[in-house]
Amino acid sequence: MHCPFCGAHDTKVIDSRLVAEGDQVRRRRECLACGERFTTFETAELVMPRLIKQDGSRQPFDEDKLRAGMQRALEKRPVSVERLEAAIGHIKHQLRATGEREIKSRVLGELVMAELQKLDEVAYIRFASVYRRFQDLNEFREEIERLAREPAKE
């Protein structure tokens, strides 16, 4: 680590602590050349897998697009921003946990539907109707009946 005061290359770590709920390491360092102390923060760089679309094209994971799609389904529904953000965090965690560099977009769609089902059943039906391309009222009815038969997921 370079000293921000004198530019020397040699520093020593005086103290290390976990911060940000264990997602970050805070280190107090001392420059061996000038004796100045400074603080650094370390976080893991977590790369999201790329998505393989149905047509075979590939695109990077876009958290904003995920959020917009979920917000559209949740429009005018009684779900807090905090619960939405927690669901997005859970989806991202599951994607990273696959350990894959690329995943089919279908996997992401299924994760979104599972989270929406836990958040709000109306939002789930809205999303599923677009995602699964419901063609008529019977497809809506079948999905609603299937949802009514399943035990609530939390």
Curated annotation (Swiss-Prot):
Keywords recorded for this protein, A-Z: ATP-binding, DNA-binding, Metal-binding, Nucleotide-binding, Repressor, Transcription, Transcription regulation, Zinc, Zinc-finger
Residue stretches making up the ATP-cone domain: 49-139
Cofactor note: Binds 1 zinc ion.
Keyword Heme: no
Pfam families: ATP-cone, Zn_ribbon_NrdR
Any one GO BP annotation for this protein: negative regulation of DNA-templated transcription
Signal sequence coordinates: none
Cofactor dependence: Zn(2+)
A molecular function GO annotation: double-stranded DNA binding
Positions annotated as zinc finger (unnamed): 3-34
Domain of life where this protein originates: Bacteria
Family designation: Belongs to the NrdR family.
Main function: Negatively regulates transcription of bacterial ribonucleotide reductase nrd genes and operons by binding to NrdR-boxes.
Protein name: Transcriptional repressor NrdR
Species per Swiss-Prot/TrEMBL record: Pseudomonas aeruginosa (strain ATCC 15692 / DSM 22644 / CIP 104116 / JCM 14847 / LMG 12228 / 1C / PRS 101 / PAO1)
